[in-house]
């Protein structure tokens, strides 16, 4: 199985459903014998540029380990979910478990 880093932006009006969305994606990954190594909720942040006339979005970061089929299903779910404005998936060489720079910045 390969390691991936996923960042997705959720519509600010759907912020209440973020935890349910994340749990659904986590269950989908774990059902396929995958693992979630890191999950960070960065909260509502200002976008660098407007997306669909919105200036804020709810950011989520996940570092996961899964097979290609599960990743394809996740990406399909991201595309067909109207609440997700953007998503980015990057393949990593190894699992990343330490806190990201965004979370370290929040703690200070």
From Swiss-Prot:
Cite the entry's keywords alphabetically. Ribonucleoprotein, Ribosomal protein, RNA-binding, rRNA-binding
Query: Which InterPro entries does the annotation name?
Result: Ribosomal_bS6 (IPR000529), Ribosomal_bS6_sf (IPR035980), Ribosomal_S6_plastid/chlpt (IPR020814), Transl_elong_EF1B/ribsomal_bS6 (IPR014717)
Q: Does the keyword Ribonucleoprotein apply?
A: yes
Keyword set includes Magnesium: no
Against SUPFAM superfamilies, the record matches this protein to: Ribosomal protein S6
Q: Name one Pfam family in it.
A: Ribosomal_S6
| GO molecular-function term, one example from the UniProt record | structural constituent of ribosome
A Gene Ontology annotation in the biological process aspect, one of them, is: translation
Q: Which GO terms describe its cellular component?
A: cytosolic small ribosomal subunit
The record's annotation in PANTHER family points to: MITOCHONDRIAL 28S RIBOSOMAL PROTEIN S6, SMALL RIBOSOMAL SUBUNIT PROTEIN BS6M
What is the annotated role of this protein in its UniProt record?
Answer: Binds together with bS18 to 16S ribosomal RNA.
User: NCBIfam families from the xrefs?
Assistant: S6 (TIGR00166)
Family, per entry:
Belongs to the bacterial ribosomal protein bS6 family.
Specify the protein name.
Answer: Small ribosomal subunit protein bS6
In its UniProt entry, the species of origin is given as Dichelobacter nodosus (strain VCS1703A)
Q: What is the lineage of its organism?
A: Bacteria, Pseudomonadati, Pseudomonadota, Gammaproteobacteria, Cardiobacteriales
Q: Which gene encodes it?
A: rpsF
């Amino acid at each position: 199985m390969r390691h991936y880093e996923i960042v997705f932006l959720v519509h600010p009006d759907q912020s209440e459903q973020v935890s349910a969305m994340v749990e659904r994606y986590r269950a989908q990954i774990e059902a396929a014998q995958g693992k979630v190594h890191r999950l960070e909720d960065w909260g509502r942040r200002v976008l660098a540029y407007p997306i669909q006339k919105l200036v804020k979005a709810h950011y989520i970061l996940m570092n996961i380990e899964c097979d290609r089929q599960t990743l394809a299903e996740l990406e399909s779910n991201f595309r067909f979910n109207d609440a997700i404005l953007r998503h980015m998936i990057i393949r990593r060489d190894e699992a990343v478990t330490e806190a990201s720079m965004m979370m370290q910045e929040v703690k200070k």
